[in-house]
Swiss-Prot record:
InterPro entries: 3-IsopropMal_deHydase_ssu, Aconitase/3IPM_dehydase_swvl, AconitaseA/IPMdHydase_ssu_swvl, IPMI_Swivel, LeuD. This is 3-isopropylmalate dehydratase small subunit. CDD domains: IPMI_Swivel (cd01577). It catalyses: (2R,3S)-3-isopropylmalate = (2S)-2-isopropylmalate. It comes from Histophilus somni (strain 2336) (Haemophilus somnus). It comes from the Bacteria.
Amino acid sequence: MAGIKQHSGLVVPLDAANVDTDAIIPKQFLQAITRVGFGKHLFHEWRYLDEEGTVPNPKFVLNFPEYQGATILLARKNLGCGSSREHAPWALADYGFKVMIAPSFADIFYNNSLNNHMLPIRLNEEEVEEIFQWVWKNKGCEIHVNLENLTVTTGNKIYHFELDEFRRHCLLNGLDNIGLTLQHEDKIAEYEKNIPAFLR
């Protein structure tokens, strides 16, 4: 898994608060247990006019031509509230999002996103409003995120965010739970060699 040190990407402004996980990925698409294939169902009930997902809703922001290929999602407070389904970050990641910016995230969704190698950035509401205004005035613009310096840059404006140092280390080095464990592979092997036979 590749580390994330910096990311520049097209930002899409989802002007909605309290976007729950059922809106992100509706329950009828939760049968699969692998992480791929959910992107086509992302925001299904907002993104499409039919149940089959063949008629795009031209009024939904993800369908606007200027936001095709977006990798940064900008939203309002309490993003990812509702049920704790891990399919929500799977769908966002499979669609192509690498970074999310909002004033706040539901706790479980926030942690699930980090576990799935996406970066959820918390800025205060005034800063998020500034970014919304900037994006609306500069359609098709890119935002630059620097995980090493913990900064978000829009044009000439720089915003600073906080992230737990352990989480930052994992993202910078492309480490998931398995990768973290394998960092101590030699110690694990040494421990297993010294386990008494009757405990093996």
